[in-house]
């Protein structure tokens, strides 16, 4: 699963918009949109924010996807 797919799935599970996710993560809507379209991936600091957000919501986010992004591997 790509990072883009994981973010789309996360929003779907939470039933929130790109805007709502952006607000929760303190990032721009454009950033969420670029992630979902596979144009960019988050930096390491933002990955930690995503992890914490998922943990706070008891969401089993695709952490293997996060680890591959951390290592610079692209799916």
Model-identified regions with their sequence ranges:
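Residue-level recognition of specific faces of alpha-helices
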Residues: 6, 31-34, 46
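A short, Lys/Arg-rich alpha-helix, primarily the initiator
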Residues: 1-13, 51
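Short alpha-helical DNA-recognition segment
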Residues: 15-34
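Short, charged recognition helix plus adjacent turn
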Residues: 44-45, 58-75
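Short, basic-rich loop-to-helix N-cap that marks the start of a DNA-contacting helix
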Residues: 39-52
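Residue-level detection of the helix-turn-helix DNA-binding "recognition helix"
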Residues: 8, 12, 26, 37-39
